[in-house]
Amino acid sequence: ALVEPDGERTFMSFSGVENQWNRQWLARLTVAPGSLLYFSGYQLASPCGELLVEWLEKLQDVTPFIDFGPRIGDIPDALLARIMACRPLVSLNRQEAEIAAERFALSAEITTLGKQWQEKFAAPLIVRLDKEGAWYFSNDASGCIPAFPTQVVDTIGAGDSHAGGVLAGLASGLPLADAVLLGNAVASWVV
């Protein structure tokens, strides 16, 4: 990532093994019921995205966690519909939420987006708003978890670290609100 003095970032991404999934590799995986599975938009928008979604559709009792990232606009509509039919927990930043709202014909206003998301997909949603914290929406609850005060040095990796914190919280049995709180804490340490 290239960071300009004003904090604007430009990413140069190159695909590697993470986008080379094949049927043989997936067939060897044992996924226990109740597992959390992380997928990135880079994987889902790559040529192996179709294969990953086909594999996901066959799994029972798992929670997909999807961080679409900047590739949210690159996933074909039909594949995106199949992904959302798996009722994943989706984590978006502010810009990605705007793109998602447009793609799914939902409101871009965060609280309305969350309500409409629940009505349309019955799946959890996290919207990360940098220093304003993160909103979470689920069938059970919704709310905004404030960000932790921090001295921002470098925001590269903030979204990934937030995802890691949320996943660690969920894997530990925390409810979504507390998992988002942990994600906020981890992201504040990284930036």
How does the language model describe each region?
Residues 18, 63, 89, 124-126:
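A residue-level structural signature of the nucleotidyltransferase/glycosyltransferase Rossmann-like core
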Residues 1-39:
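Conserved N-terminal subdomain of the carbohydrate kinase-like
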Residues 32, 85, 120:
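Structured loop/turn residues at beta-strand edges in well-structured enzyme cores
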